[in-house]
Curated annotation (Swiss-Prot):
This is Ribulose bisphosphate carboxylase/oxygenase activase 1, chloroplastic. Residues 1-58 form a transit peptide. InterPro entries: ATPase_AAA_core, P-loop_NTPase, RCA-like, RuBisCO_activase_AAA_helical. Activation of RuBisCO (ribulose-1,5-bisphosphate carboxylase/oxygenase; EC 4.1.1.39) involves the ATP-dependent carboxylation of the epsilon-amino group of lysine leading to a carbamate structure. It comes from Nicotiana tabacum (Common tobacco). ATP binds at G169, G170, K171, G172, Q173, G174, K175, S176. It is found in: Plastid, Chloroplast stroma. Belongs to the RuBisCO activase family. It comes from the Eukaryota. Keywords: ATP-binding, Chloroplast, Nucleotide-binding, Plastid, Transit peptide.
Length: 442
């Protein structure tokens, strides 16, 4: 054992020399691999044999071929700027006094994703046919929307273009759907907001959200893709519907924020930071039923261009043709249906089409049994049932249409809330059910 230990110690103490017989006269193989490495010897060396001069191994420099650089290269971000608000805010953390930063945990100083992975929660992407086969876009509607969006992307001399386009009109007239059709036609993926996001339990949160969504749209535009901010039912979230609605701080700040963005569309800042670099101008499209409920300075002509949408008979026929396009309903029958219900909104005809499937669903329920509906719909290996398209005749459509109209009349005629306050009886609806066996007036 002792002999082994001493032998090992002697071996370990032997230094490695390139000049003696231990190392030999050949050059040791390098640990580097690749064809781009070459061995550089001292000056005056004529043979590969190693001399007393030091050995240097360097890598040969190769010119980078730009043609090999692809968009899918994972290292492309090292030489190109992929900056966005998420990263910019994070860089400012610790560099700005906490007095001017949002409270911890509000999400304004946390980078959630890398910029090339980041997709806004409000981004609406359309995967449908851009040719819009079977769908009808009203010419007046499309003209107004396309001209407004285009004007906001142009630099017109000495002209102040309103940033906001307010589309308002009656309920169920297809304002939002027509906007989405135009966006698809133009190849725009809008940043979406709704009235429910314009109120919060935290003061100032909706106003901050508007700024965030606006800058997200500006970032998309900066990268070469058309975008806009689309707010549905603005009057429902920021308007006053009479004395029964409370005017909150958030209502006030939403109106003020939209006014400020309309006045300074290229200088929209987020809470807790200030970036001197201007953002892209983003056109804002808002819909609503009554803009008189909004703050008057917001809807003045310099800030908001207003468009009242009231579809004509030709528009209604065109939209309804698109609604019944897969049901093989003749064009003349569509015209009869539209003319039979002149006072109804466009979504009435969509509800009418859905009512026709009631008979098919009723047949399936009677054949399956009420007790087994849950198992068949949710726990079946075969999946939920599929139905063939029922045949839609003009007689059946008119019958269901009249039923929908009677339901509407009942709501206006009965008015149970007033009856509850005035008397103990249930009103006309109860009398109709007792006398006629139906809730509909005879």
């Amino acid at each position: 054992m002792a002999t082994s230990v001493s032998t090992i110690g002697a071996v370990n103490k032997t230094p490695l020399s390139l000049n003696n017989s231990v190392a030999g006269t050949s050059v040791p193989s390098t640990a580097f691999f690749g064809k781009t490495l070459k061995k550089v010897y001292g000056k005056g060396v004529s043979s590969p044999k190693v001399t007393n001069k030091s050995l240097r191994i360097v890598a040969e420099q190769i010119d980078v071929d730009p043609k090999k650089q692809t968009d899918s290269d994972r290292w492309k971000g090292l030489v190109q700027d992929f900056s966005d608000d998420q990263q910019d805010i994070t860089r400012g953390k610790g560099m700005v006094d906490s007095l001017f930063q949002a409270p911890t945990g509000t999400g304004t100083h946390h980078a959630v994703l890398q910029s090339y992975e980041y997709v806004s929660q409000g981004l609406r992407q359309y995967n449908l046919d851009n040719k819009l086969d079977g769908f009808y876009i009203a010419p007046a509607f499309m003209d107004k929307l396309v001209v407004h969006i285009t004007k906001n992307f142009l630099k017109l001399p000495n002209i102040k273009v309103p940033l906001i386009l307010g589309i308002w009109g009656g309920k169920g007239q297809g304002k939002s759907f027509q906007c989405e059709l135009v966006f698809r036609k133009m190849g725009i993926n809008p940043i979406m907001m709704s009235a429910g996001e314009l109120e919060s339990g935290n003061a100032g949160e909706p106003a901050k959200l508007i700024r965030q969504r606006y800058r997200e749209a500006a970032e998309i535009i900066r990268k070469g893709n058309m975008c806009c901010l689309f707010i549905n039912d603005l009057d429902a979230g920021a308007g006053r519907m009479g004395g029964t609605t409370q005017y909150t701080v958030n209502n006030q700040m939403v109106n003020a924020t939209l006014m400020n963005i309309a006045d300074n569309p290229t200088n929209v800042q987020l809470p807790g930071m200030y970036n001197k670099q201007e953002n892209a101008r983003v056109p804002i499209i808002v819909t609503g039923n009554d803009f008189s409920t909004l703050y008057a300075p917001l809807i003045r002509d310099g800030r908001m261009e207003k468009f009242y949408w009231a579809p004509t008979r030709e528009d209604r026929i065109g939209v309804c043709t698109g609604i019944f396009r897969t049901d093989n309903v003749p064009a003349e029958d569509v015209v009869k249906i539209v003319d039979n219900f002149p006072g109804q909104s466009i979504d009435f005809f969509g509800a009418l089409r859905a009512r026709v499937y009631d008979d098919e669903v009723r047949k399936w329920v009677s054949g399956t049994g009420i007790e087994k509906i849950g198992d068949k719909l949710l726990n079946s290996f075969d999946g939920p049932p599929t139905f063939e398209q029922p045949k839609m005749t003009i007689e059946k459509l008119l019958e269901y249409g009249n039923m929908l109209v009677q339901e509407q009349e009942n709501v206006k005629r009965v008015q149970l809330a007033d009856k509850y306050l005035k008397e103990a009886a249930l009103g006309d609806a109860n009398a109709d059910a007792i006398n006629n066996g139906s809730f509909f007036a005879s």
